[in-house]
């Protein structure tokens, strides 16, 4: 089940209460990873570099000029707890920022605004079987769109290259 309640820990918690096994990650991992801002702050504790970000909720008072000054352009504005790059905007100037924030607020109660990290986009699946962790090969994500947006993900405007074309030492990390 895509999104809430399938990816945010709610369904997993319900299944745990009923003693029904399932094949996704558990409640904690699901809840943590569905909230981008909290997840990014958590993984920073392990030395993982993440984009600088600001999280706003509907009650937040914010200053567009201050956000622009803090994060610079371009930046991404997206629902903090959404997925699929839905209502995500790559903002290139201060003139686009307010509209991008409002678009994301139409989908969720909180919005994350992130600086951009330039580079190669990769994804990696992993799973656990009988207490053994298995990591799949890295896949490089290449799109002709400006970023890996909803249409790239769901309308086939993407090329996925496995293994990713990155140095072996980077893959090992």
For each feature predicted by the language model, list its residue ranges:
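Short, contiguous strand/loop micro-motifs
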Residues: 25-27, 87, 168-169
């Amino acid at each position: 089940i895509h999104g809430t309640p399938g990816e945010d820990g709610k369904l997993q918690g319900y299944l745990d209460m009923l003693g029904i096994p399932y094949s996704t990650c558990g409640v904690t991992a699901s809840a943590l990873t569905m909230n981008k801002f909290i997840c990014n702050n958590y993984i920073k504790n392990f030395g993982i570099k993440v984009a600088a970000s600001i999280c706003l909720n509907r009650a937040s008072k914010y200053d567009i000029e201050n956000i622009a000054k803090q994060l610079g352009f371009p930046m991404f504005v997206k629902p903090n707890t959404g997925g699929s790059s839905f209502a995500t905007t790559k903002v290139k100037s201060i003139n686009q920022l307010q509209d991008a924030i409002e678009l994301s607020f139409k989908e969720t109660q909180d919005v994350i605004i992130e600086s951009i990290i330039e580079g190669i986009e990769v994804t990696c699946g992993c799973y656990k079987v009988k207490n053994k962790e298995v990591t799949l090969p890295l896949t490089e994500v290449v799109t002709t769109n400006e970023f890996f947006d909803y249409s790239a993900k769901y309308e086939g405007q993407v090329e996925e290259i496995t293994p990713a074309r990155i140095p072996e030492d980077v893959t090992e990390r």
